[in-house]
């Protein structure tokens, strides 16, 4: 479980992940814009729904789930909605998944996603939804998520970043 005191280390991990794993998919301008659409939503930590994977005192992964309406973004992202979802009608959100580039494709993201889905199910949700970066789509597809909508996030600087809204029914 992530704690508020972990925030500085989480931010470093997020920056490493964005710069290391998204670089093959995005231009430099899009990478800069990604920082606006991604990052840490501290509400997840306050809600105790955000997790970290720590290996030898190094954060190698983080992510979580949410029962709030905001689908993606950080504290600074426009159009946030911290109102609660209805588990009987809405999908829980899988949020802010980041892996250290040196630990990519070693099961860290899968571990965090599985914990988030399990916790969402315990909270009464029957499905999960997330907003995937181009780098994450294949991971989520491999775990049963289905692409529902392609969006282009337009940053304040005018750069457009392609993302995919995905959904999964929990078993």
Question: Which residue ranges define each predicted feature?
Answer:
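Conserved GNAT-fold acetyl-CoA-binding loop/helix
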Residues: 15-40
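Conserved acyl-donor/pantetheine-binding loop and adjacent beta-alpha core of acyl/acetyltransferases
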Residues: 54, 62-104, 119, 153-162
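A short beta-loop-alpha structural element at the N-terminal edge
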Residues: 1-12
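Conserved acetyl-CoA pyrophosphate-binding loop and the N-cap/start of the following alpha-helix
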Residues: 102-103, 107-115
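C-terminal "cap" of GNAT-fold acetyltransferases
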Residues: 126-137, 143, 149-171
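Hydrophobic beta-strand residues of extracellular immunoglobulin-like
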Residues: 49-52
